[in-house]
Structures are given as C-alpha cells and as structure tokens.
A protein has these predicted regions:
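Polar helix-capping/helix-linker motif
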Residues: 12, 72, 350-351
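Aliphatic-rich helix starts adjacent to a transmembrane/signal segment
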Residues: 16-58
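Short, ordered "entry" segments at domain starts
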Residues: 101-240, 245, 270-377
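Low-complexity, Gly/Pro-rich coil/beta segments used as flexible assembly/activation regions
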Residues: 53, 57-111, 232, 248, ...
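N-terminal leader/signal peptides at the extreme start of proteins
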Residues: 1-14
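Charged, amphipathic alpha-helical interaction segments
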Residues: 20, 39-40, 44, 64-67, ...
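Eukaryote-specific, low-hydrophobicity, charge-rich regions
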Residues: 246-276
Length: 377
C-alpha cells in the first residue's frame, strides 16, 4: 500500500519542472522587456535632451548675434511695434528667428525662437529665449553750451549761447531747457565783441568738474566708434552716397553725416539719419566741412574755419578755434588746460542735436538686472 502511494505521488509531480521552466522564461522575458523599454525610454529622453540643448544653443546664438550686429536703425523703431527678422541657420541643423520690440525709455525686448531640425527639415525641438536691452547712453553732465575743466577764453566776434536752439530747419524737436552759456572750473573771460549768454550766462569755478565728467562718457562712447581716425588734419568733410539705389556712404571717412535740412541747398537726404561716432586717439585739425553725431578727440582739437557740426564734441586735450564760419550746435566738453574760442565761431546749446546724436549712434546692451528670460509656450 505504501509503495503504491509513493508511485502515485511521483506520477503527480511529472510536468512540474516544465511548468517552473515556463514560469522562469516568462519572468526573464518580462525582465528583459522591461529593461529594453526602460533603455529605449532613457535613450529617447537623452535624445530629446540633446535636441532641446541644441535648440537652446540656437536661440542663444540669436540673442548674441543681435547684440554683436546691432544697427542704429533699430533705435528709431516704433514704440511697441514687433519687428521680425528673417530666420538664420546655425550649423547644418540649427535655426533661430528673432523678434525685436522697442519699448519706452530706450529699452527693447528681444525674443528668439531656436529650432533643431531633423534630417528632412522638420522641427524636432524648439526653445524660446528673451532678453531685455537698453541703449547704452552714457551719463553726460551737460549744463552749458561749453563745459571746460579749466578756464574759457572767448574773443573776436564769438557767440556762445546756452539758450536751447534747434539746428537750422530741423523738425520734430521737443522743447528743451535753457542752460548756461559756459561752465568752467576756472574763470570765463570774454574779450572784444564776444558774447556769452545763457541761463545763467556763466558758471565759474565749478569744483564738480572732475576728470570723470569728461573721461567716463568719452570712454563709453569710444567703444562704439563708427569711425576711428588717426590724429592729423582733415579738410572737406561732406556727406556722400554710394550704390544704386543710392545710400549714405559710411565707408567714406570724410562722410560725417548731413546736418543740413531743406530748404538749404545741396542737402544729401540719404545721410540725414547718419550720426557717426568719430574717434581720434591723437590731435585733430579740422577745416572746411560739415557733419553731425559725436566727435571724440583724445588729444587737442583745432578748428580752423568754415566747419559746421551738430551734436556732441568731447575733447580730452585743449580746444582752439580760429577763422570764420565755425559753428557747433549741441554741446562742447573739453578737459584740457587751454580753451580758446576766438575768431567768428558760434557755439549753440541744443538739446535736440544732443538727443539725436545719442539716439542715432549708440548701440544696445543687456539690462544689468533681469536681462535674460526663458519663454514657455
């Protein structure tokens, strides 16, 4: 009886190994499938992360490109108007698109979409970045038509006026505030028929006229120079055009813009919006010509005659004028020890000429606080 019972048990255990083997195979297959799926997901996630990074890099390239190639034409865009730029490829599979919006107070919002493209040109990843910008307008301490760290000597038939004056025939100028005629760290001396007027006419022995009043804006603007000219004599500055249709020829180093406006004769309209920043690391002598913008002279400036300039003149050395027909409308700042304005020149303070010279010549820079944003669509 016992032998029969054991035989029956052995017969009941037949096939158990096969069942266990099948169960083990199913478990192993499930584990392999799980590992495979997890690996596939991790690989897909890695690819997505790489593509997202590449799209972000394309967007960053768009941000940097706008700053590196800033055009002063952007400075005059309409307020709160979106200006879209053509898409640009970055390498074989990256692309960015830029939209620039001008806001009030000389500020801008730059939005950039970066795309990573697939082999067929389809978009496989997109990232949006933004940056707040502002025009890099330096802090100019202009409180007079002529500002000198040393004394000012005026002679001949010179007229220096701090009463706000628009350049001849310019339109669209907002009303300004009258300034002093001359402001200096020493005395202002007028001889002969010279006239220094303003509100007040003179500010003398001003102890606040330290070096930084002149060097700080000079160095800021120097870094944005449109024309860098060696020291020397320059004659016959006049606006010129090139190409067809004609456009202002900024490559001509004697083209300093067009300060004239209709109905004056010989107006070169293509250059009326060209306000270059002209920088010389040496001393300059200018004679017979016209221009507008910002003139920076690290050495001495000698104005010989028949020279007309609308905008800002900053001289780190001495300033001398002679002859007739010289006229500066805007502001003159000089840090040298000798300021002698004689002959028959005119120096008129003009808030309009100053504002346009800055607006049409400076470039943009990121806001120091909260300049960068990432947009989420």
């Amino acid at each position: 009886m016992r032998r029969a019972r054991l035989t029956a048990l052995r017969r009941d255990e037949r096939g158990l190994a096969l069942v266990l083997s099948l169960i083990a195979m199913v478990v192993i297959a499930a584990l392999i499938s799980g590992v495979f799926v997890a690996s596939r997901q991790e690989m897909a996630g890695g690819r997505s992360a790489v593509r997202a990074t590449q799209a972000t890099e394309a967007a960053e390239a768009g941000l940097n490109d706008m700053l590196a190639n800033w055009s002063v034409a952007y400075n005059t865009y309409g307020i709160y108007g979106d200006s879209a730029f053509p898409s640009v490829m970055v390498g074989p599979s990256g692309r960015y698109s830029q939209v620039l919006t001008r806001m009030r107070g000389g500020k801008f919002l730059l939005r950039v979409r970066g795309d990573q493209l697939g082999a067929s040109g389809n978009v496989i990843a997109t990232r949006y970045l933004g940056r707040y910008l502002r025009l890099a307008i330096p802090d100019l301490d202009i409180q007079a038509a002529v500002t000198a760290q040393d004394g000012v000597t005026a002679g001949g038939n010179i007229d220096i006026t701090g009463f706000d004056t628009n350049p001849p025939n310019w339109t669209g100028c907002a009303p300004g505030i009258n300034k002093a005629g001359a402001r200096s760290g020493q005395a202002v001396t007028a001889h002969g028929a010279s006239s220094v007027i303003g509100s007040p006419a003179e500010i003398e022995f001003d102890s606040t006229l330290v070096d930084s009043v002149f060097t700080s804006p000079f160095n800021t603007l120097k870094g944005m120079a449109t024309l860098t000219l060696p020291g020397g004599s320059y004659t016959g500055m006049t606006p010129t055009v090139t190409g067809s249709p004609s456009r202002c020829n900024g490559a001509n180093t004697l083209n300093w813009g067009e300060p004239f406006a209709a109905p004056a004769a010989g107006v070169v309209t293509q250059c009326q919006g060209y306000f270059p920043i002209i920088y010389s690391p040496g001393s300059m002598v200018v004679n017979t010509g016209r221009g507008q913008g910002i003139l920076l002279v690290a050495g001495d400036l000698n104005i010989q005659g028949n020279f007309i300039f609308d905008g800002i003149v900053i001289v780190l050395g001495s300033l001398q004028t002679a002859g007739t027909g010289n006229k500066v409308t805007g502001a003159v700042l000089t840090a040298g020890q000798s300021v002698s304005i004689v002959g028959n020149p005119d120096v008129f303070y003009s808030s309009c000429a100053i504002a346009r010279a800055l607006q049409y010549s400076v470039r943009a820079e990121p806001l120091r606080d909260r300049s960068w944003v990432q947009r989420v669509n």
